[in-house]
Amino acid sequence: MRFPFLRIVVLLLVTCVMSFFSFGQKTNNTWKSLFNGRDLSNWDTWLRATNMTGYSDDEMIGPPQPPIGLNNDPLNVFTVKDGILRISGEIWGAITTKEEYGNYHLRFVTKWGDKKYFPKDTLPRDAGVLFHCTGNFDYAFKCWMRSMEMQIQEGEIGDFFNVGGGVAEFQVKEKVKTIYNETADQYDPSQPLVRHPGRVWRSGNFESPKGEWTTSEMVARHADAVFIVNGFVVNRLFNIFRKDLNEQVTRGKLQFQSESAEHFYKKIEIRPISFVQSRPVLVANQKEYTLSALQNQQIEITNKGEAVEIIAAELIGKEIDSVVIKLPPMPMVLKKGSKIVLPATIKQGTTPGNVVTFRLETVLGPVSDFQINLITK
């Protein structure tokens, strides 16, 4: 049987297996920092022309101007102070890794500033992380490479956008109204896989309040990817394919956008993922929990099988961002015989009678044969 949320990959070469971390064991899960907290010596910068005005390669104020270009930042769009990277957003562009990456787990911590710039000074603050980036720096709107995007936008961190990097498969609920009254297809793992060329809205809003730091993650696994916000899976895509090249897209550089909004990063780090599988057997002390805004429920989960590394949780159903579950620091290794207890409640005003499915995530996808139902009261 095919499970779209977990593609099993067997590596036959032992030398390849040994080059990755095993998520089924307690391993040295060392992260490599991509941002050293001092400068951008590990990055390239690119900025387009100062008088370009929006999502057009031709829309300019006045006569055409050349781009500011590569590793030239006269307006200090990208600056580092006290271990924090500031991206002003004043000119569209990006910082770009010098290396390409594939089969990785990316983690970054960000928060919004106050400043916004034309042409998006009246719109929600916006940025993004582009992955599997290839080609010229100025492919899209004279400022970004061919890529796929994990959107970083107020209230919508974890949206997917296609920036010319190929077409992927998604599970979506069609024509949903977003928080900004737009119409978009929304990630919904209860739906069948379809090939989708454009935007896919995140499943729920798990961001921190403005002014606080949000931890976002991406697992890029071959031609698939998973987006995670503050410990919760919010989007998932499969089989990224470039028709013009007749091949899957599995690796590339990373870009962090400047797109009209001031924002900050205090951590950007990456680690390789492991394809070594374990056989955990996770059992909850109840199959269903009734959640109330008046008191916490305690979700108790015991591992009766092999050790497994958990990187996130996922909620499936309606109003999932009204369910409040306190997760432990991730990633965490759940050993055989050990258990975790997760306090769970709901926000005031949540619609009663909703059934929300809860499951746990590894770098290879959801833990097999484990899910529980949460019923709102």
Regions found by a protein language model. Give the residues of each.
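Beta-sheet-dominated interaction scaffolds and their linkers
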Residues: 276-305
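Short strand-edge motifs at loop-to-beta-strand transitions and within beta-strands
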Residues: 214, 297, 338-344
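Surface-exposed binding patches on compact interaction domains or structured appendages
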Residues: 306-341
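Short, solvent-exposed loop/turn segments enriched in Ser/Thr/Gly
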Residues: 292-299, 347-357
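Carbohydrate-interacting regions of secretory-pathway proteins
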Residues: 25-281, 343, 357, 364-371
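Bacterial Sec-dependent N-terminal signal peptides
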Residues: 1-27
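Short beta-strand edge segments in extracellular beta-sheet folds
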Residues: 373-377
